[in-house]
Amino acid sequence: MKKVKFLLLPVVMVMTFGCQKFFDVNPQGVASPTQLKSKAGVGALLVGAYSLLDGVGSGTTQWHASVDNWVFGGVASDDAVKGTDAGDQPEQSFIEQYNWVADNTHFRGKWQHSYDAIARCNEVILFATDPDVKDMTDAEKTQAVAEARFLRGHYHFEAKKMWGNVPYIDEKTYKPNDPTGVLVTNTADIWPKIEADFAFAAANLPATQAQKGRATRWAAKSYLGKALLFQKKWAAAKTELLDVYNNSGKSLVTSFHDNFRTATNNNRESIFEVQFSINDGTGGQNGGKGSTLNWPYTSTSPGRGCCGFYLPSHNLVNAYRTDATGLPLIGAVADGSQDTYNNVDVPNDQGLKFSDAWTLDNSQPVDPRLDWTVGRRGVTFLDWGKMPGSSWIRDQNYSGPFTGKKWMYYLSEENSTTHATDRRSVNNNFRLIRLSHVILWLAECEAELGNLAQAQTYVNLIRNRAKGSPVQDASVNTKVEPYATGTFATRGAAFAINAVRHEQRLEFAMEGHRFFDLVRWGIAEKVLNAYVAKESVSGRGWDGRTFTKRAYLVGKTFTAKNNLYPIPADEILNSQKDGKSVLTQNPGY
């Protein structure tokens, strides 16, 4: 544990809240512990704990702890490549190529941010339960603690899925004035304590909150269900998730794309949303700065010219291929090894200049979610016109022909959506948990429990929404249909599990989940080595054109140790007590 992280940090005092989102507030001064022993003080501490949800503000590099986990959950998976060019952010290249070492500063930044945030949560709990706080009712204190425990559960969850073997720090362990006293081993399983945080939050939070962005009962129950899901506790996870599905009042929005627009922030599908804001006096720091590198590389595109990172892979684009009946090209093996979608590539302009003649071949169908997720040449890009090709890509030969699209803003909304002096700072919230997550997690539970018909029902809810959503470009050949009655039961459990997993990929691509899903399913090594083997060689589109893919991936291998990231070397060094490190490194590093 990094010693300095557990010193009592100066805490921002926020005495009043205006019409801004409740944690988009400028620092107003430094408060003493005495001042914090009040309703306003506890509220300010809680704002501080919420404020780190976006991954920015703990002193680390912005993208090391971005809420969307685009490096650790996306670039490390088969969804995306690093992008940009070979020389930019080489530490990310090491992550992409599974060459992981404990002194990579990306790992330390994520660790530092996680435990800084946990410390803030513990401060809230300590002050909220202090008997010297006289101007809060017991109910108000309980709710403050419940919100802090929800956040503490989230931040520990983030650490757990990264490193597996991590210390759990609660308000009893936390000793800001005794850095060595807080040192805790990382050998115990912390899942029960994460569960306890979410369970307490679920029992003590209201179903709705007046201020958008605050945790609710349904957010806590959803997260508890997710924690149980990660442990393969299918029946227990189903209980929590089914309560959310049946009783939260949430429903799917009509258009898939409405989960990714500023105009539809905090919509009826959203269960827990990280709030972004702009023009609030912070210089754009509250505008999703963890993703500041992930914009097309030209001044005539969203973001206005930087920096070309986090680009969709050919494998991901091909995953959206469908057959003539609108169903995915997947097989009856749960690890996806019999899937055929990656046998032929979706036609693309890899290797061509934007000025070279090229026409998109639409002779085969794709799922319409593809063109709300990925920017590709010849297809309308929101209201920016047709994506022009390599002029939007920093180095197409290195990073490929596609660009991210899910979180991009409309040209017509640029002034209202972006910061006045930084077009890469936006007020488009990150939907951390939405009802579609809950539905597909329920589908996963049912498939694993053998209830295949019910699993199919849940999957079809998502596929029917995709079918009914507006298409991005009417000229594209799109086709998506629900599975026919009895398909899962007829084709068996392995097919059903694979279909659920594939649907999660299609629905949540480029949102930073894929790597962690592959790991928890126990198929990361097989899937990612197959991905590297195919993504590193020449491709061939169904139009017959051949092209070179990512040659730098040749010979790269994912091994069993890569299921967990290495614990930062500095954190192990700083955990020394009586000359011996308390933290233990993960196997293989």
Predicted segments with their positions:
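Conserved, well-structured interaction surfaces
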Residues: 39, 43-47, 51-57, 83-163, ...
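Bacterial Sec-dependent N-terminal signal peptides
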Residues: 1-27
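Membrane-proximal, proline-rich intrinsically disordered regions
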Residues: 19-71, 579-589
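Long, intrinsically disordered, low-complexity segments
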Residues: 18-19, 73-76, 83-86, 114-117, ...
